Amino acid sequence: MAGNSIGQYFKVTTFGESHGPAIGGIIDGVPPGLSLNAQDIQFDLNRRRPGTSRYTSPRSEPDIVEILSGVFNEKTTGTSIGLIIKNIDQRSQDYEEIKNLYRPGHADYTYEKKYGLRDYRGGGRSSARETAIRVAAGAIAKKYLYKINKINIRAYLKQIGHIHCDFKDWIYVNNNPFFCPNPEQITELDLFIRNLKKLGNSVGAKVTIIAENLPIGLGEPVFDRLDADLAHALMSINAVKGIEIGDGFSAITKLGSEYRDEITSQGFQSNHSGGILGGISTGQPIIMHIAIKPTSSIKIPGKTVTNHNQETQIITTGRHDPCIGIRIIPIAEAMVAIILMDHILRFRAQCGDRKII
């Protein structure tokens, strides 16, 4: 299987399956001398891991990361960093009844048709379990980016179902299980998700990611534009079905006189472009929004076929999230960090004699 790596100068490769003994990754390109230990990575892993609230999958994984290589005396050596996270709470028996069925909306059908077989236990390689390693790699990138330029990457829940989350302040985002920036809406979100769980259903979401304090000049036209690479990375996350950068789809109804970001001696007067022009960062905040589909693993019967093309019905009985969007926040931050880290290193390789502004 190809497609297990992302990045050029900062390259992340992941391995492992949902119900295998472990998941892991190799991170190449981390400059030497960065202070790093497991606790630097663990904070974001704890934000992503399942079983931390009644609103997410009850699968209880501690997600303790172990650094296998590339760090000595809590400093990166410049060699490949190897990471591993043991899988502890697999319940493969939950999938025995559906091993010969294709779950609608999942990768079961396409994996088996492409490869001729599939790991039916929790989706195998297609499971979001793999994203724990992305979060670990992203935590390393975040630390480096903040160290060199105080680059800050944060995300929050913008919408869940019909509920739009009004932005109040970043201080609230990590203080509730929804990553909601408005404490006044927590009760409404709580009732909505609890009712969904009673119905055995799920719902989609919208997540906003903002990267700040970026230098001007990140991005490699024409095929490695910064916005193209960010879209690639964010669309690689399980369940993400759409992305916009800046005023993306809302630009359809705008006039050129409204949309263009006019410039004065004091800088840009607006940021409709979302911090990227011509595929290159402008130095303004990069603002991204992603759309997340509702999980297809629900307790409401649905039509499907067996691997012998016999029509039947399916009810998913495993442990799943009523809204995947709640857990995507740290994953989205990680993918943005990985891309920005890669482009920082690419900028230095090509334009090393120019100061990062």
Curated annotation (Swiss-Prot):
EC number in record: 4.2.3.5
Annotated keywords: Amino-acid biosynthesis, Aromatic amino acid biosynthesis, FAD, Flavoprotein, FMN, Lyase, NADP
Example GO molecular function: FMN binding
Positions of FMN binding: R125, S126, S127, N238, A239, G278, K293, P294, T295, S296, S297, R319
Protein's GO biological process: amino acid biosynthetic process; aromatic amino acid family biosynthetic process; chorismate biosynthetic process
GO cellular component: cytosol
UniProt catalytic activity: 5-O-(1-carboxyvinyl)-3-phosphoshikimate = chorismate + phosphate
Cofactor(s) listed in the protein's UniProt record: FMNH2
Source domain of life: Bacteria
Family (UniProt): Belongs to the chorismate synthase family.
Assembly and interaction partners: Homotetramer.
Function description: This reaction introduces a second double bond into the aromatic ring system.
Protein name: Chorismate synthase
Naturally occurring in which organism (per UniProt): Blochmanniella floridana
Lineage: Bacteria, Pseudomonadati, Pseudomonadota, Gammaproteobacteria, Enterobacterales
Gene responsible for this protein: aroC
